[in-house]
A protein has these predicted regions:
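Phosphate/adenylate-binding glycine loop and adjacent helical scaffold
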Residues: 2-233, 304-312
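Accessory, usually C-terminal, subdomains that scaffold auxiliary metal cofactors
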Residues: 225-303, 310
Length: 312
């Protein structure tokens, strides 16, 4: 197995890289604020599956050939045996040839149902390694209950990845029920983020370029999303021509404003489940999630660049 591919996704919502902290919104929705505050500690629990050996081994065990296939197939499997064009569209920032290298071939090696099951087995093993005794704690059970409440009656029109994952059965154990709810919530946020990128007129490459301009990891994003240096440079040129980047490919004031608007719209579009949970529930879930995410970070299961402390 090629372990160098194990850093392929690094997919934290937004999918184009770490989200920059935007300037304060002049009239913030409090639940948009909760969406932002809850995102990072919950994301630390979700993304364990993208980096843990346990999930990779689970995919290899059902016949998938490598880490990259496991990533694209496992995140797509909730939608069924979709064509690569569907995954490319819903994941947004990965090049079409990169996705087409593993889909639909993966569906001939394992069914989407078997891939979903393998993902859960790998996730459970990884979370148990990362959390230790906390995996079976009352805090995990309470967090699962709260995160699940945020999903009750959730409208997913226009949110294909969130809808697909919401349609999966809720696992019976609190640990996996928590991961399932977090996954629906992060895909819900991600679907809204992609809409914000489209509304801002940022195509997949331009989305990545602006993520780098906002402080995202340039080497990592350039090497894992499947775009050529020429395609990347062309994206930079388009953004300079729009006045969003300067000659050093850093943000102009206009570029910073556009990216800040994307982040504000992402938070606003992610607010609905947290509004359902209510402020006391949001505050309690944040109180529960932060120690769990710090335990995961301290376990060494995540790459160092993703294991920093979550913001207050």
């Amino acid at each position: 197995m090629d372990h160098s591919r194990r850093t392929l996704p690094g997919v934290s919502a937004p999918a184009d890289g770490p989200d920059p902290d935007p300037a304060p919104d002049p009239d913030p929705d409090p639940f948009a604020g909760w969406a932002r505050r809850l995102y990072r500690p919950l994301e630390a629990l979700h993304i364990v599956g993208y980096f843990a050996e346990e999930t990779t081994q689970a995919y290899l065990g059902i016949g998938l050939t490598d880490y990259g296939m496991g990533y694209f197939a496992s995140r797509s499997a909730a939608m069924g045996p979709v064509r690569p064009e569907v995954t490319t569209a819903t994941f947004y920032v990965f090049s079409a040839p990169l996705v087409a290298a593993v889909l639909p071939r993966a569906w001939g090696l394992a069914s989407p149902e078997d891939i979903v099951d393998a993902r859960l087995r790998g996730i459970e093993a990884a979370l148990r390694r990362g959390l230790g005794d906390a995996a079976d704690s009352a805090e995990v059970a309470e967090a699962a209950e709260l995160a699940g409440q945020a999903l009750v009656g959730l409208e997913t029109a226009g949110r294909p990845l969130a809808a697909a994952h919401l349609g999966l059965p809720v696992p019976s154990t609190p640990l996996l029920a928590l991961w399932h709810a977090i996954t629906v919530l992060r895909e819900y946020r991600g679907d809204g983020h992609l809409a914000a990128l489209v509304l801002a007129g940022l195509d997949p490459v331009e989305s990545l370029v602006t993520a780098v301009a906002g402080g995202g990891p340039a080497k990592f994003l350039k090497s894992t999303r499947g775009w050529s240096p020429e395609q990347w440079a062309a994206g930079q040129t388009r953004l300079r021509n729009r006045g969003l980047l300067d000659d050093d490919n850093s943000f102009t004031d206009a570029g910073q404003a556009v990216r800040g608007t994307v982040e504000h719209r992402t938070d606003a579009a992610a607010a609905a489940p947290w509004r359902r949970l209510g402020e006391p529930g949001c505050a309690r879930l944040l109180e529960l999630a932060r120690p769990l995410s710090r335990t995961i970070a301290a376990s060494g299961i995540l790459p160092a660049r993703l294991a920093g402390p979550d913001p207050s």
